[in-house]
Design a protein with these regions (language model features):
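Redox-cofactor binding/interface segments in oxidoreductases and associated redox assembly factors
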Residues: 7, 138-141, 337
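C-terminal auxiliary extensions adjacent to catalytic cores
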Residues: 393-440
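Internal hydrophobic alpha-helix adjacent to the cofactor/substrate pocket in enzyme cavities
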Residues: 351-371
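A glycine-rich dinucleotide-binding beta-alpha-beta segment and adjacent secondary-structure elements
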Residues: 278-344, 351-353, 371-388, 393-399, ...
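N-terminal FAD cofactor-binding segment of flavoenzymes
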Residues: 19-25, 29-81, 375-379, 383
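Predominantly flavin-linked oxidoreductase catalytic cores and closely associated redox partners
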Residues: 112-267, 276-287, 291
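N-terminal Rossmann-like FAD-binding beta1-loop-alpha1 element of flavoenzymes
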Residues: 4-27
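Helical element adjacent to the flavin cofactor pocket in flavoenzyme catalytic cores
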Residues: 98-117
C-alpha cells in the first residue's frame, strides 16, 4: 500500500489527508504546532485550528471566495463540509464556530481507517522527517509558524510577513442598548452586532489608538503585512479617516434615519452568540492598551476580553523558485509543500492547496501528471501565481486579477459571468480527471 506522511494538521494537512485516505492511500498525519505554544496564536489542541478570523469569507455568487469554495466543493472538499456543519450566522459570509469546526474535522479524521494520527512532534529538518516517518511521499504543511530548522532545510531563500489578530470579547460585557443588529445594506439576516460612532467618538478613538502602547517588531526586520492582516493602528497612521473609509465604513447603515460617522462590526464566534470578534480590529497594542482603547467604543465600556489581539510572524517559501507544477520541491521531488507555507494566503486557499496537492499525488501514484485547471478558474489562477516568477513573490489569495476570463460586460455582470463560467470550466476539468477523482 502506498503511504504518505503529512507534517501539519492544519487546514491543508487535514484536507490532503482525508482526500488521500478516501482513495486508499495510507496516511500518517502529524500535528506540528510549535513546541512552545503561543497562547495568543494557538488556543486549541485539536486539528484545523482557525487562528485569525472565524470567517471563510463571502458566499455571494459574484465574489472570488465564492468561486474558490464552489470549485473545492465540486472536488469534494471534506473541510468545507465540516464548515457547513459548524456554521454560525454571519450574513453573506460563511463563518464557523472554531471549536465545533475543529471537532468536526477531528471526527472525520478519526472515522477514516487509512489515517494514523501522530502526537504533536517537533521535526527539525526534512532529513529528520524522512528518517523518523518514512513514506513514499511527504507533505510539509506546517503553516506560517514553521520551525526555523525545518524552514532552512526547505530553502535558504524564504520570505515572511506579519499577521495581526483581532480581539474577541464576551457578550456579557456588552451594553446592548447602545448596539444594534444589522447586516450591511440590510442584506440577508441581521447577523452582525454593530457599534455606531459619532464624529467626536471616532476622533477620540483614533487619538487613543495612535497614542497607545504597542509591541515592537523583531530587530532588523521591516514590518510587512498582507493587506487584510494589517493592524488597525497601522491603518490609522496612514490617515485619520482611513478607518472610516475602511473597516469602520458606515455605508449601508442607518441609525434613526441617519448614517453614523463610522461603524464597528462585531461578528459572532458561536451559535449561542456568547462571544464576538471585533471585525477589522487586528492589533499589536499591548493588552492593557487594548482594554483602554477598545473600551472607548460605545457599548464596549465594560468589555470582557476572551482573547486579546496580537501579531505574529508568518514564514513562507519562494514558491516560484522552489516548487514544480505539482507543488513538490524541485530539489526534493518526493516532498510537497501545502498551505500557507507554500505561499497561499487565506483559509479557503489553504484548503484548496491541501486538496490540489492530494490530487497531484494521486495522479503521480497512477503514473500520470495532473493537468492544470483552466485559466478561468480560481484553482488555475492560484496555481499559476505559485509557479510564475514576477519579482519578489508575495502571498497569493483568490481574486479576479489571477484569472484569465476577458469580457466587456458591465462590472457586476462581469463578476457574475467570471464566477459562473469559472465554476463551469472547473466542473468540466474535474469530471475529466476520471480515476483521480474516484474515492473508494
Amino acid at each position: 500500500m502506498r503511504r504518505v506522511t503529512i507534517l501539519g494538521a492544519g487546514l491543508a494537512g487535514c484536507e490532503a489527508a482525508l482526500q488521500l485516505a478516501a482513495r486508499g492511500i495510507a496516511v500518517t498525519l502529524i500535528e506540528a504546532k510549535p513546541e512552545k505554544i503561543e497562547p495568543a496564536v494557538y488556543r486549541q489542541d485539536g486539528p484545523a485550528e482557525l487562528v485569525c478570523s472565524n470567517s471563510l469569507k463571502s458566499e455571494s455568487n459574484a465574489t472570488p471566495s465564492y468561486q474558490l469554495k464552489a470549485e473545492c466543493r465540486i472536488a469534494g472538499s471534506f473541510l468545507l463540509g465540516a464548515a457547513e456543519a459548524a456554521k454560525v450566522a454571519a450574513g453573506e459570509s460563511l463563518a464557523v464556530d472554531r471549536d465545533t469546526f475543529s471537532r468536526e474535522v477531528a471526527a472525520l479524521l478519526a472515522a477514516e481507517r487509512g489515517i494514523t494520527l501522530a502526537a504533536n512532534t517537533v521535526v527539525g529538518s526534512l532529513d529528520d522527517l524522512r528518517e523518523r516517518f518514512p513514506a513514499d511521499l511527504h507533505i510539509v504543511a506546517t503553516g506560517p509558524l514553521t520551525s526555523p530548522g525545518l524552514l532552512a532545510s526547505l530553502s535558504a531563500d524564504n520570505h515572511y510577513f506579519y499577521d495581526a489578530i483581532a480581539p474577541i470579547v464576551s457578550a456579557e460585557g456588552l451594553d446592548m442598548t447602545r448596539l444594534f443588529w444589522a447586516d450591511r445594506y440590510e442584506k440577508g439576516q441581521p447577523d452582525f452586532l454593530n457599534c455606531p460612532l459619532a464624529r467626536q467618538e471616532y476622533e477620540r478613538f483614533v487619538d487613543a489608538l495612535l497614542a497607545a502602547d504597542k509591541l515592537p517588531y523583531a530587530d532588523h526586520e521591516r514590518p510587512q503585512f498582507f493587506d487584510r492582516c494589517m493592524p488597525i493602528e497601522t491603518m490609522a497612521e496612514r490617515g485619520r479617516d482611513t478607518l472610516s473609509f475602511g473597516p469602520f465604513r458606515p455605508v449601508g447603515f442607518e441609525v434613526e434615519g441617519k448614517r453614523p460617522y463610522a461603524v464597528v462590526q462585531l461578528r459572532a464566534e458561536n451559535a449561542e452568540k456568547s462571544a464576538f470578534n471585533l471585525v477589522g480590529c487586528q492589533t499589536r497594542m499591548r493588552h492593557h492598551a487594548q482594554r483602554e482603547v477598545f473600551r472607548l467604543l460605545p457599548g464596549l465600556e465594560n468589555a470582557e476580553f476572551l482573547r486579546f489581539g496580537s501579531v505574529h510572524r508568518n514564514a513562507y517559501i519562494n514558491a516560484p523558485e522552489l516548487l514544480a507544477d505539482g507543488l513538490n520541491l524541485l530539489k526534493h521531488p518526493d516532498t510537497y509543500v501545502a498551505g500557507q507555507l507554500s505561499g497561499v494566503e487565506g483559509y479557503n486557499e489553504s484548503i484548496w492547496s491541501g486538496l490540489y496537492t492530494a490530487l497531484a499525488i494521486l495522479a503521480r501514484f497512477d503514473g500520470k501528471e495532473l493537468p492544470p485547471p483552466p485559466a478561468a478558474t480560481m484553482s488555475g489562477g492560484l496555481l499559476r501565481k505559485l509557479r510564475a516568477p514576477a519579482g519578489r513573490f508575495a502571498p497569493v489569495n483568490a481574486n479576479f486579477s489571477i484569472i484569465d476570463n476577458p469580457t466587456r460586460l458591465r462590472k457586476r455582470d462581469r463578476k457574475l459571468f467570471h464566477v459562473a463560467d469559472g465554476i463551469r470550466q472547473f466542473g468540466e476539468w474535474w469530471h475529466g480527471l476520471e480515476k483521480v477523482t474516484q474515492a473508494t
